[in-house]
Amino acid sequence: MKLKIYLWLVLWLTVCNSYASVTWKVWNTDYRVDTTFHAKIGPGTTQTSLLLTGPDTTLTVFYLTVDLTDPYVDIRTVCATDHLAGAQTVTQMAESHSVEGESLYFAGINGGFFAMSGTANDGKTSIVGRPHHASVAEGEIYRTSTSAICRHFGITSDKVPYLSSASVDFTGTITTATDSYEISGVNVNAGNNKIILYTDKMPGQVTQVTGSSFPMYYEVALMPKAGERLVPGKPCKMTVKGAWARGTNMAIPDGGYVISGKGLAGPFIQSLNDGDEVEVNLPMSFDGETVMVEHLTTGNPKILGNGEVLNTEGERADAIEWHPRTSIGYSKDKKKLIMLVCDGRTEISRGVRTRELADLMRYAGADEALNLDGGGSSTLYTSMLGVRNYPSSKGVQRKVGDGVFVVSTAPASSFVGGIDFATPPHVISKGEEYSPTVYGYNAYGLLINTEMSNYTITCDERIGYVKADGKTFVADGIGL
């Protein structure tokens, strides 16, 4: 069976031409913006490629637009190797987490800044890939923030996005039948009078509380009770496992936790006995609003707020330099998510400073936006079309610490249930021929065929005719 597309070519080619080429101001400079690619690639998701031409430079830009109201699309972060340390390419993260018929990670970008070298406190375990600041994936806190200049993108389980104007506030608690104590962080270095919670994602699966002062730290293991799961903002009942110890760099049990502290925190930990029940709560708040985020990544600076470019370049030294950049943001109604990469350090694309990146995000439809890790990390991946941008390391993807992904939760289906154009809209002159590129999609809107052949096109005879091959239009009509 052949599928048919009826081409209202005069309407499509003329109206879409205004969409394909416009003028847009990028930090006081006018650029001609040409759409070089635009197509649906998955449930509620399109990918768009742009060429911006200015007075003395060009820029290549690639972005995803995701309809968060689509029932078959989800947004998820991945911490590389599913551990606090470890690096993978964006492609590797997507492929390793995809489960056919359950969750296909069909598009994504790199995430926040991460350690590119170094070892843990033991001096031997690598920390390469460890996020510099907060990271949450599948509701699990991999790390909390350690810097006031961090800004965060988070999204809830019901797909409501948030972007902080300041560092996400984190103050957890551990409560016994008679007492409670503040938890100051997760998987970060301990401090005097503070309790830190360590998870089994730690490098070496130990607390890494070592060094000259480590004999002063008290530690004890905890395990969630049956049916309990520790996620941001939801109290979790746990049981103390074993006796507390001092200065042991304690091993963290699979699926469990260890709390560590010294000074005033020491007596609290010493009061815990094997079998005691405790409750742990780890709330996070964005600009004062407590949010139960399911996924979170970190960047800086925040570049767009309420649709306005923010004067935040002073927050990081390289913000005023031209580099490849990655950004994430969302529309004013929070129903559209934008994930964007601008290439840089190439002959065809200079790269941008963060104020320019903000204007690119405005063009793409964002009202709020955050600068993520860029440079050689900048990557925009799709499962069917590959990496869409040109990573600055000669096109080779860098292994990074985390990524943000668009996930199809639709059932698996390899049957082509619909077709659509994948050729950038443009104008053709009378007498010219035009053969559009056509993509095939399953019933859930997932791109499954980029080489469709079993289709024919038709058109109104007043604008031209279709050749015998059924796929080539000739513009020889008088118009509508």
Describe the predicted segments one by one:
Residues 432-446:
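Beta-strand-rich structural segments
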Residues 458-474:
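Low-complexity "stalk/linker" and mucin-like segments enriched in Ser/Thr/Pro/Ala/Gly
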Residues 426-432:
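Short, solvent-exposed loop/linker segments at the N-terminal edge
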Residues 118-147, 151, 155, 294-366, ...:
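Conserved, well-ordered active-site substructure
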Residues 21-257:
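Zymogen propeptides
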Residues 1-23:
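Bacterial Sec-dependent N-terminal signal peptides
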